[in-house]
Amino acid sequence: MNPFWNMPSASVRKRSDNDEKIATADQKISPARSSSAKKQLPSIPKNAVPITKPISPPLSVQSTNGTHASYGPFYLEYSLLAEFTLVVKQKLPGVYVQPSYSSALMWFGVIFIRHGLYQDGVFKFTVYIPDNYPDGECPRLVFDIPVFHPLVDPISGELDVKRAFTKWRRNHNHIWQVLMYARRIFYKIDTTSPLNPEAAVLYEKDVQLFKSKVVDSVKLCNSHLFDKPKIEDPYAIIFSPWNPVLHDDARERMLAQKKSEEQSRGLHVSGLSWVKPGSVLPFSKEENSLQT
């Protein structure tokens, strides 16, 4: 049974008496009203908020990339996943990347140069993606060891990516294009507005000395190939010397898989032919069989 329903009548009587006293006091304070006037509610103060009026909800918080803050992180994660899928589909020759374990905004990578002035070069790098991607500036690409190149800062090792992407355009520019640009600079040298003026001048004035410094730079990068990563991360790219016990078997399996893929591709492409081997004439019955 509700205890409030069993309150003694005396307490109820006392409360009613108090209410009457308060009402009498209010009547004394309030101005006299004419009997002919209609009943009116007391005026509301200027700064008062009506109790019945609900407080308006706060404006929706927008994240830096224009999406709602509640699902902004999920949108960013989806965008980066889509970008990495595009990188895998492009199959950039000699370029390998791996997102960091600690942050999807940081990717580890390596470029293998197979011909040209920087032949045999193995250059490790890190891609830094802005936290408001894809609406912010273009990603940054920094080589672990500064490469002697007109477009690479000789101190920080950062590549001049903004040269190719002056304004990052959403849904038009992609991270795989940045990786392709980083690969292309080693095959097509550009000396306009360089980050390394010495490299640019040598390429224009003394190509032989430029080649000599490039060879030294390649040797320096390769000599540090087996060093520990500068950033401790489980997904960082690590190189180790060739170990026949570990690597021979893996190498054979990779080559066998590649050979089987080439054979299956060749069988699929060849198909059936109605052309006689060694000629351009279609198959036909032998003349002797026609005479008989």
UniProtKB/Swiss-Prot annotation:
GO terms for cellular component: FHF complex; plasma membrane. It is found in: Cytoplasm; Cell membrane. Keywords: Apoptosis, Cell membrane, Cytoplasm, Membrane, Protein transport, Transport. It comes from the Eukaryota. InterPro entries: Ub_conjugating_enzyme, UBQ-conjugat_E2_core, UBQ-conjugating_enzyme/RWD. Signal peptide: none annotated. Residues 75-223 form the UBC core domain. Pfam families: UQ_con. The keyword Cytoplasm applies. One of its GO terms (biological process) is early endosome to late endosome transport. It is a peripheral membrane protein. Residues 14-23 have a biased composition (Basic and acidic residues). Its main location: cytoplasm. Residues 1-44 are annotated as: Disordered. Belongs to the ubiquitin-conjugating enzyme family. FTS subfamily. May function to promote vesicle trafficking and/or fusion. May also regulate apoptosis. This is AKT-interacting protein homolog B. It comes from Xenopus laevis (African clawed frog).
